[in-house]
Structures are given as structure tokens and as C-alpha cells.
Amino acid sequence: MFSSLYPLVRAQLFRMDAEDAHHLTLRLLRAAGRTGLAGALAPRVPDSPRTVMGLTFRNPVGLAAGLDKDGACIDGLAALGFGFIEVGTVTPRAQPGNPRPRMFRLPQADAVINRMGFNNAGVDQFVKNVQAARYRGTLGLNIGKNADTPIERAADDYLYCLERVYPFASYVTVNISSPNTKNLRQLQGAGELDALLAALKDKQQRLADLHGKLVPLALKIAPDLDDEQVKSIADTLLRHQFEGVIATNTTLSRTAVQGLPHADEAGGLSGRPVFDASNEVIRKLRAEVGGDVPIIGVGGIFSGADAQAKLDAGASLVQLYTGFIYRGPALVAECAQALAMRAA
């Protein structure tokens, strides 16, 4: 029912400022999660279980981090049929992010540009929100660093967040690829990444001993990488036995949107224009890591065929964000059905 109504809802939301519409959507999702309305209105999504990173996913179509930064809408989102939910990015301390306006739609390209800057209420509130959710499915918690933490001390922020979220996560995503936190992508460099992953894996083992469970770690990377950088990242993931990698975050490229309104705004571009670049990174990663590091594919999925293309490139699971904004819950069902049929 809601799927047929969503174009009308979207038309109203798209008349609003992009960030105001985002906040309204979150409020509606929070209310729908409390009342059970989201599940009643959402299209039926078939179960198509997958085992990845040692975890069972109800279906291979997840929500990417960034929509629900504070983990306040988990129940409402889960009712829409996602096989897994990822929330965040969260930082040790609350921070406002970058000045507004900082989110821009490019509807002619089915795209969004954002420079949010990890705005969030901090990890303590994040954990409270996660604990309050009734959802018991697969839940990814995405961690980052505060904007005012020197890049040389970035590992401290990631280690602190990992310790705080560890007991409540199905898996933890380490986000080093947002273009909206100064110098963050430097952590994708060979030396910096090697040191960070070594520290995280050491912390993971100590937390596993403490809590009696091993929570997988996934690394989220950018699409703006050359072949040598992809190989270096793949080698580092293998060396430290990271459990997963998410490919990819938003792009700094504007080639596909030149001349469109807002195309020159600073920030990361997501949506249809990042689809091919994301797939190319997935293919290169798969060639380097084989089956040893599962890949979660994200970037520009607007149809079931797009989701299948991610798996064909080498991903084991997919995530939606911008396509979900443009198409609504119907996209979740379409992608899940397409992947279930392919697996049958």
C-alpha cells in the first residue's frame, strides 16, 4: 500500500529543503516503529537467508549507514523489509557537523550531494538508542572520528567507539572514507591503514574475550581509488584478517553531473552517478581478496537489476541509501525479490 503512495509522499518531501525533509522522514519512521504502522504498510519482502561474515542475514538487501545517524529509527526501518540495518556514523562526542545548507538533491541525475560532516549525538546517546530498539535482526554499527580529533589520533576515536558499541552490534563498520571530515581519507593510505587495522583487530580480540563473542569488523572505503590503492587496501584487509569491506562511499567526482543545479556544491555525491565506479571497485577488490573478505556493495542501486549487478561484480550483500530516498520501500522489495529469484 505504502509503495503506491510513496510517489505522492516523495513529491511533498522534495518540495522541502533536503535536510528538513530528512528530519521529517526520521520522525515519521520513529513514530511508525513505535506503532507498528511501517510494517503494516510496507510491501512484503521474501526471506532469502545469506550467511556472510559468520552472520545470518534475512535477505541480502540492507540499509546503508547515514540515513539514521543516531540509531533512533531502527524499528521503523526494519519493518520496511531490509535484511539488515546499518546505523551511524557515530563519533565519541556529539558534534553538529558542517554548517547548513549541507544536503542537495540532483533529481535529474537521481543523485544527492551531502557534506553533513558526521553530525550526531555522540556514542553514549547512540548506544542508548540502540539498546531501546526492539529489533533483533542483523545490525551494523558504523563508527568514525570527531572532526576536531587530529588525524594522528584518529585511532583513539575508533577504538573508543568500538569498545562502546561492541556489545550491541552484529558487526561494526569502520568508516574511513567520508569526504566530509578533513583528512579522513588519508587513513586509506597504506601505512595509516595498516596501523589502524592492527589496533582495531587487537582491540576486537580483547573485547571478544571480555564479552564472549567475536563481532566482525568491516571497512568502508571510497570509490575514488586507483588500481594501486585498491590493491594496497585489499592486501591490508587480508593481512589483518578483516571480516568484511563495504564498497563504496560517496564520490568527489562530478563528471556525471556537470552543469546540473548544485553540481558544484562541495561534498560527496551519491546515487546513480556512483554506480559504475562502485562496481569497478568491487570487481577489483574481488580479484584481489577472492572469497576471503566478503564485500557489501553499495552505490547507485535503483532496481533489482542494479542489485544483481553488484553481486555479479563480486559483492555478497548490497545496501541502499539514495535509491531508497528516490524510490521508497518498493525498492527494498524489488531488490530482495530479484536476488531471491537469482539464488533459487
UniProtKB/Swiss-Prot annotation:
It is an enzyme of class 1 (oxidoreductase). It is a peripheral membrane protein. The keyword Oxidoreductase applies. It catalyses: (S)-dihydroorotate + a quinone = orotate + a quinol. Its EC number is 1.3.5.2. It is found in: Cell membrane. Pfam families: DHO_dh. Its cofactor is FMN. Binds 1 FMN per subunit. FMN binds at residues 65-69, 89, 142, 175, 220, 248, 271, 300, 321-322. Pathway: Pyrimidine metabolism; UMP biosynthesis via de novo pathway; orotate from (S)-dihydroorotate (quinone route): step 1/1. Disulfide bonds: none annotated. GO terms for biological process: 'de novo' pyrimidine nucleobase biosynthetic process; 'de novo' UMP biosynthetic process. The keyword Lipoprotein does not apply. GO terms for molecular function: dihydroorotate dehydrogenase (quinone) activity. Its main location: membrane. Keywords: Cell membrane, Flavoprotein, FMN, Membrane, Oxidoreductase, Pyrimidine biosynthesis. Belongs to the dihydroorotate dehydrogenase family. Type 2 subfamily. HAMAP family: DHO_dh_type2. NCBIfam families: PRK05286.1-1 (NF003644), PRK05286.1-2 (NF003645), PRK05286.1-4 (NF003646), PRK05286.2-5 (NF003652), pyrD_sub2 (TIGR01036). Monomer. This is Dihydroorotate dehydrogenase (quinone). It comes from Paraburkholderia phymatum (strain DSM 17167 / CIP 108236 / LMG 21445 / STM815). The gene is pyrD.
